[in-house]
């Protein structure tokens, strides 16, 4: 299956929490091993574990993570807030490849998640078309990029 088809699942997962994650973005993530989804998750609401954490924790055989690909709709965070950085968990679990729907323009992230992953040897790929992922979080992006509500 292509990265584009797999990334569509991220959008589906993220939409499960529509209207409940503010001020955080909607994010879906899952993990593929040998072409099969072995774990998935989404960010349920602010202050709770992020999608990447939910996906990683849902994997029944964690030893498979070291030969798996993580797909996520948004660049993994790289800062400490109410939860620790997802990029740190990804490298701690030795996930070798991450495919991202779109980058996160939040000043706390904005390339830092990708930078952390790459500096730890993780192969990072982006969706060929980030538009559906940006549209998913247009309210979040408007607030972060223009410092105003989405109208």
Language-model-detected regions and their locations in the chain:
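Zinc-dependent deaminase
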Residues: 1-20, 62, 81-151
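Acidic helix/loop or adjacent segment enriched in Glu/Asp that either coordinates divalent metal
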Residues: 3, 43-59
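Acidic, glycine-enriched active-site microenvironments
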Residues: 24-27, 68
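Short beta-strand scaffold segments in enzyme catalytic cores
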Residues: 27-35
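Local cysteine-cluster metal-coordination motifs and their immediate loop/turn environment
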Residues: 42, 49-50, 70-91
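Phosphate-handling active-site elements
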Residues: 60-67
């Amino acid at each position: 299956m292509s990265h584009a088809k797999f990334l569509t699942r991220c959008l589906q997962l993220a939409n499960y929490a529509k209207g409940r994650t503010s001020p955080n973005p909607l994010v879906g993530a899952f993990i593929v091993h040998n072409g099969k989804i072995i774990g998935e998750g989404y960010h349920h609401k602010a202050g709770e574990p992020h999608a990447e954490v939910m996906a990683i924790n849902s994997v029944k055989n964690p030893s498979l993570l070291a030969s798996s690909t993580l797909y996520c709709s948004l660049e993994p965070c790289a800062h400490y807030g109410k939860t620790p950085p997802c990029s740190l968990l990804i490298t701690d679990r030795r996930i070798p490849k991450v495919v991202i729907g779109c980058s996160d323009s939040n000043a706390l992230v904005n390339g830092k998640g990708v930078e952390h992953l790459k500096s730890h040897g993780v192969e990072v790929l982006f969706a060929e078309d980030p538009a559906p992922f940006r549209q998913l979080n247009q309210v979040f992006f408007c607030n972060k990029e223009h410092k105003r509500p989405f109208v």
